[in-house]
Amino acid sequence: MSQPIYKRILLKLSGEALQGEDGLGIDPAILDRMAVEIKELVEMGVEVGVVLGGGNLFRGAKLAKAGMNRVVGDHMGMLATVMNGLAMRDSLFRADVNAKLMSAFQLNGICDTYNWSEAIKMLREKRVVIFSAGTGNPFFTTDSTACLRGIEIEADVVLKATKVDGVYDCDPAKNPDAKLYKNLTYAEVIDKELQVMDLSAFTLARDHGMPIRVFNMGKPGALRQVVTGTEEGTTIC
C-alpha cells in the first residue's frame, strides 16, 4: 500500500455530498462509504479532522432570501451541520472508528464543545474529530470553518471534497470542454476568478499558507489517492 504524504488532514465535506439521488437529507449508503474511506486513512496512520456542511438540510443564505432573518437562518444552518456530524459519527462508530464530535457552541448531552487542545489530543490518539456548528458565528461559511479549523489544528492540507474532479476554468456541467487544472497558485485562483470557495475562506488559507486540494469524493478511492500523493484533483498552494 502506498504511504500517505500527509500526517494530518482537514477533510471538508459539503452537505450536498451526503444526499442521495432524491436530493434530500442524508443517504446512509453514501455516509457509510465515506466512513469506510476515512477508516482507510486512519489505518494508514493519518490524523483526520472533518468539517461538514449543512446544505442538504438548511442554508441560511437561502432562508434569508425567502425573508427570514439571516442570523436566524445561519443558526439553523449551524444546527444542520451538527445533525450531519451526528450521522457521520454514527457511521464511523459502526465502521469501528473512534470519533469525537465537537460543536462550536454548547450542546450538552449531544456532543462536546469545541476545545482546541482537546481536539489536538484526540487527533494524536488517532481519533477522527468532527467539527460542527461552523465557527459559531453567522455570516461565515463552512468553507471558512474548514480553513480556520485546519489552521488551528496545524493540518498539512485542507481537502475539499466536491462533486467534480477538481477546479475547472469554467463550469464542467455547462461546458464539456472545460479545462481541469492540476496545480494552481492562490494568486491564479483570484486572478482567474475561479470558484474554489468563498473569498473569506480562501484568503484565510492563503494568508496562513494552508494548501488546498479539491477532488471528487464521488469517485470511490479518490480520497486515498489524494492522501497518497497521486495526481488526483487540483492542488492550490
From Swiss-Prot:
Stated name of the protein: Uridylate kinase
Gene3D superfamilies: Acetylglutamate kinase-like (3.40.1160.10)
GO MF: ATP binding; UMP kinase activity
Compartments where located: Cytoplasm
Start and end residues of each stretch annotated as Involved in allosteric activation by GTP: 20-25
GN (gene name): pyrH
EC number: 2.7.4.22
Nucleotide-binding among keywords: yes
The organism of origin for this protein: Haemophilus influenzae (strain PittGG)
InterPro entries on file: AceGlu_kinase-like_sf (IPR036393), Asp/Glu/Uridylate_kinase (IPR001048), Uridylate_kinase (IPR011817), Uridylate_kinase_bac (IPR015963)
